[in-house]
Curated annotation (Swiss-Prot):
GO terms for molecular function: calcium ion binding; calcium-dependent phospholipase A2 activity; phospholipid binding. It holds the Pfam family Phospholip_A2_1. The lineage of its organism: Eukaryota, Metazoa, Chordata, Craniata, Vertebrata. GO terms for cellular component: extracellular region. Belongs to the phospholipase A2 family. Group I subfamily. D49 sub-subfamily. Residues 1-21 form the signal peptide. Disulfide bonds join 38-98, 54-144, 56-72, 71-125, 78-118, 87-111, 105-116. Binds 1 Ca(2+) ion. Its cofactor is Ca(2+). Keywords: Calcium, Disulfide bond, Hydrolase, Lipid degradation, Lipid metabolism, Metal-binding, Secreted, Signal. SMART domains: PA2c. This is Basic phospholipase A2 PC10. The keyword Calcium applies.
Length: 145
């Protein structure tokens, strides 16, 4: 085997080992990102919602910093309601389509439909309100008490 081929094979193996250490997003959260993209017509990168205000991202506490953050709080509460119904919202995959007016749910089971409705309402809410860069990556221990 040629040395160049060995180097290429080594590079592929090393990159695969590195990638295996990155935890995957729960399936539904990856799907939620696509629903958001449908609702806002791709205006904002999905990562903008992963660390915004007091509620957009993992956890959440305090008073939402603005209407966009309130969308995330409402979404968290909707997921909590889904869990009370026995659903697993961060793992539940559902069926939806992206129409000219935004995303629409067409799931059959109760859990799929409930989780899809949570995501579509949040995505539509995100699309309605402005994004304030000052509320990205804030100090939550100070601003979200």
């Amino acid at each position: 085997m040629y040395p160049a081929h060995l180097l290429l094979l080594l590079a592929v193996c090393v990159s695969l080992l590195g990638a295996s250490a990155i935890p995957p997003l729960p399936l539904n959260l990856a799907q939620f990102a696509l629903v958001i993209k449908c609702a806002d017509k791709g205006k904002r990168p999905r990562w903008h919602y992963m660390d915004y205000g007091c509620y957009c991202g993992p956890g959440g506490s305090g008073t939402p910093v603005d209407e966009l953050d309130r969308c995330c709080k409402t979404h968290d509460e909707c997921y909590a309601q889904a869990e009370k119904k026995g659903c697993y919202p961060k793992l539940t995959m559902y069926s939806y389509y992206c129409g000219g007016d935004g995303p629409y749910c067409n799931s059959k089971t109760e859990c799929q439909r409930f989780v899809c409705d949570c995501d579509v309402r949040a995505a539509d809410c995100f699309a309605r309100y402005p994004y304030n860069n000052k509320n990205y990556n804030i100090n939550t221990s100070k601003r979200c008490e």
